[in-house]
Amino acid sequence: MQKQDIENRKTFRIFVWASFLNDLGSDIIHPIWPIFVTSILRANMAALGFLDGLGDALVSISTAVSGYLSDRLKKRKIFVWTGYFLGALSRIGYSLSTIWPHLIPFKIIDRTGKIRSAPRDAIVADISTDENRGKNFGFLRTMDHLGAVFGIIICIIFFKILGYKILFAIAAIPTFVSALLVFLFIKEKKSEKVKIYRGITLKDLDRNFKFFLILSSIFSLGAFSYSFLLIYAKNFGFKVGFVPVLYLIYTASASLFSLPFGKLSDKIGRKSVLILSFLLWALVCLILILSPSQMMIIFTFILYGAHKGALEPVQKTFVSELAPEEFKASCLGGYQMVIGLCALPASFIAGLLWEGLGMSAPFYFSLFLTIVSGFMLFFVKKHR
């Protein structure tokens, strides 16, 4: 048992560093992505919403497919390192794009790389205990965000010197390293009990899981991408050079709050922390609807980070606990697929509302859906 504990800790550390490096590469790009798409490649907000929504939808499909296949094949590792490799490859493609439609195939490759998520999360859930599962997911997310902070700092320092395209190419390097770490150092754990895979059905799922899936889908229809907040800030008067700083504030906030919220969910329950995350996002929407000052906009990026820090790791922990043991990766992947498929219309609808009714309109829409889904969450049975 002690030997297994050592091996589990080693596996977790490798995933932590792989996640850190991957997010470092990703977040060299993310702070300047919406401005690159709208200002350099001349896309409107609906096109930006389409690209971001397409990416989120593909994340969902690839996550679900990889979760299903990893359960069926009893293999996890291959999906993880291949996913990192595809993410690195896509960034080279971004650097070569000259008009916004060129981004579409590389966005597809990039987001298909999310085949790593459900198998990785299933491994983390398996090597964790009931007492530390929330903490482990929270720490993993914290390191994601910490890597992102370093990536954003690199972006801020070198953006004016190197420009968009060279930065995009450089962003591929740390993710290639992530792929190598997993490929070389993660040992595939053999299943102790090999069962004939019969496929997952709705009968296998707890009714609380089904209800949680429905309310999460409603919330996700209003959860448009971060790009809208950055463009909102730019249109409000922030200089282009300060936009990555706002993204840094958001990411640093998410990094600081992920682990505490993960630990808090271990103590007071997942549902309470998820309700808090909905309240934080509702507050962001209210502030931006009420035509804030620049200082209040900066504050909303802190709140947005806290919302993400509370939402993302606790969602995964909650789903992993509601899911049947033998279908854990399938449920994690299926959950991500459903809420991600909702993200495609979410960002596109937000773009259309922005273009047609003004930049506050998407926040009214999202606030309404947040209230509805938050009310529904009260009817989900508590799980520790």
Residue spans of the language-model regions?
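Hydrophobic core of transmembrane alpha-helices in multi-pass small-molecule transporters
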Residues: 20, 90, 101-116, 217, ...
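Central cavity-lining transmembrane alpha-helices of secondary-active solute carriers
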Residues: 50-68, 248-260
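Cytoplasmic helix-loop-helix junction between adjacent transmembrane helices
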Residues: 106-146, 318
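A membrane-interface helix-boundary motif in multi-pass transporters
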Residues: 157-173, 352-369
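C-terminal membrane-cytosol helix-exit motif in multi-pass small-molecule transporters
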Residues: 172-192, 373-381
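Helix-loop boundary and gating motifs at the non-cytosolic
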Residues: 2-57, 209-246
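Helix-to-loop junctions at the C-terminal end of transmembrane segments
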Residues: 62-74, 159, 258-269, 354-355
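Structural signature of the two symmetry-related core transmembrane helices
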Residues: 78-92, 172, 272-287, 367
